[in-house]
């Protein structure tokens, strides 16, 4: 399912800010996602990460379980796909591909994305 006719991604992606910790050989970066899918994330980071840099990613995904809001920590391996300087700023918009993620975690992210898309489409924000 694609968002627009020009969209070529295989998985739904939602614009949503989720806390994320990105770890590489150069240290840890705390940031948040700009958008998310079960196959990757797009983040703004304060340092350039070269394409193909291997990362450990920790996402803090807000989930609703039995009418309670809980946080699910998802840890996976990832690879930088693209890093683009933001004009006039010292940040880089960085695309990350989840290269090694547990199937259940990928499903959890996908269910989250679908739920957020449904809320977005129907205007039901809780």
Spans of features found by a protein language model:
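Short coil-to-beta-strand transition motifs
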Residues: 15, 68-77
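Short, conserved beta-turn/loop elements at beta-strand boundaries and strand-helix junctions
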Residues: 25, 38, 83-88
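C-terminal output/interaction extensions
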Residues: 87-126
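N-terminal helix initiation/capping motif
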Residues: 1-36, 44-46, 114-126
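Short, charged beta-turn/beta-strand-edge "cap" motif at the junction between a beta-strand
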Residues: 60-64
């Amino acid at each position: 399912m694609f968002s627009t006719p020009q969209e070529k991604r295989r998985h739904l992606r939602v614009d949503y800010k989720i806390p994320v910790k990105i770890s590489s050989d150069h240290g840890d970066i705390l940031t948040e996602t700009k958008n998310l899918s079960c196959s990757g994330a797009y983040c703004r980071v304060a340092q350039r990460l070269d394409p193909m840099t291997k990362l450990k990613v920790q996402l803090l995904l807000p989930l609703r379980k039995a009418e309670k809001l809980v946080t699910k920590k998802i840890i996976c391996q990832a690879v930088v796909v693209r890093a683009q300087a933001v004009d006039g700023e010292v940040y880089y918009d960085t695309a990350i591909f989840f290269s090694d993620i547990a199937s259940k975690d990928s499903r959890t992210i996908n269910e989250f994305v679908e739920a957020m898309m449904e809320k977005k489409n129907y205007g039901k924000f809780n």
